[in-house]
Amino acid sequence: SSYAEHFEKEFEASLSRFGVKVDFRRQSENYRSGKYAKYVIQAVQKRREIFDILDKFRQQVATPEEREAYYPVSIYCPVCGKDETTITSSSEDGVTCEYTCKCGHKGTWDFSKDFNCKLAWKIDWPMRWMIEGVDFEPGGKDHASPGGSYDTSKIIAKKIFGAQAPMFKGYEFVGIKGTTGK
C-alpha cells in the first residue's frame, strides 16, 4: 500500500461514519481494465487534430517535426514500469504503435489489448466528462485561466470526442496563513 492509498482509505472510512455514501471511481483501474481503450485509440487516430488544438494556445510556434512526433498518450513500460517511453510510430488505424523506453526496452504496443497507458491530462479530462456524464465541473484558477485546461479541454471534448463540455466554475485557491502553495 502506498502513502497516498493509506490516506485515501482513512478518508473513505471517515465518510461512512457520517453516513455519506460515495461511488469511488479509480481512473487507474478504469484504464487498466480496458474501459478507455477505444477512446485512447480514437485519440491516437486524431493525434494531429489534438496537436493543432493544443498548439493554438501555445506561445511559441510548433515545428512540423513536433506535430508529427506528438502522441496524446503515455505508455507504461512493461519492463521498468515507468512512463518514460517515446512512441516512434503508429499504425494508420491507431491501434498499434512502436515505442522505446529510457530503460532501453523497445516494443510494439496494442492499445486494444495493452491497457497500462494514460491519455495526457487535457485529453483525459474531456474523455472522462463524456464517459461519466459530467454536467458541472469546478476547478482552480489554473484550470480556469484563459487558454488553461478547461478552454483547451472543452474544444477537445467537442471536436475529438463529439461531447459537450460541462458547465465550469473556476475558484481561487484557499491558503492558510503562513504556508505556501495550493
Where are these regions (language model features)?
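Alpha-helical recognition segments enriched in aromatics with Gly/Pro capping
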Residues: 46-49, 60-182
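N-terminal Rossmann-like or analogous alpha/beta NTP/dinucleotide-binding catalytic cores
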Residues: 1-51, 61, 153
